[in-house]
Amino acid sequence: MHIQHATISADLENCYDSVAHAVAALGMRSFGVRATAIAVFLSCYQTMRFYLKTAYGVAKEPYGSTAETPFSSLLQGSGLAPWTFLCVSTLMINSYKEQGHGAEYLSPITLQTIKLAAAMFVDDTDHFFSGERGMTDEDFLDMVQQGINDWAKTVISTGGNIKIAKSHAKVSVPKWDRGQSRSKSIKHLPVRSFTIPQRDGAIKSVKILSYSTAMKSLGVKFAGDGENPKDHILW
């Protein structure tokens, strides 16, 4: 590719356990779920009581919550949790895309332009960015940083947070060398890291990596340059 491009892998921290119920209700309503059904679902979540079972037997006293101090989780293992999070994450992606973020791809056959903002698999999200002809490296990296900020704010507004330990950034900025397009070394970029706002108000950073660097994703280590790295076998 002869233009700048980047992929930001942002992992959501405890995604099912962090969704605010008000946002969950809005997400389900946007998919046509009746308000009465939503009230039943969420009230069950909020007031459930649990009996712990261990090797010593079942606890005599349950623990749980009340209407005054409700739980706010979607509950890991609940059959409704994946569908509810689908509703919420769809709103999140649509909101993010409405802000203008995403990479544009041109079909060489139909000449149709496709804009792809992100690809999401439950709590693992890859965000895509592409530059424009004539765009400076500084402007492109600023655009990526703004996209990260907007996504982080979107996540926080739903009750969630981005987990830094499982997130990373990959950037490719082209340069011409004897008529060949090659990627600049990361050390020659104007910045070498991006910042990610956190739910508690802190600002954390992630290093910028090249697409040839293999990173763990969905339990597999792979690079983003199309090569077949040995990292996963060694790992």
Residue locations for each model-derived region?
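Conserved pre-motif C helix in the palm subdomain of viral-like polymerases
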Residues: 13-17, 22-28, 66-106, 151, ...
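Catalytic palm subdomain of template-directed nucleic-acid polymerases
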Residues: 12-32, 69-72, 114-156, 174-185, ...
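Active-site palm subdomain of RNA-directed nucleic acid polymerases
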Residues: 1, 83-134
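Catalytic-core region of right-hand nucleic acid polymerases
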Residues: 1-6, 13-49
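Basic, alpha-helical interaction scaffolds
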Residues: 198-235
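Reverse-transcriptase-like RNA-dependent polymerase core
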Residues: 1, 43-67
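Short, conserved micro-motifs composed of acidic
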Residues: 48, 52, 56, 161-213
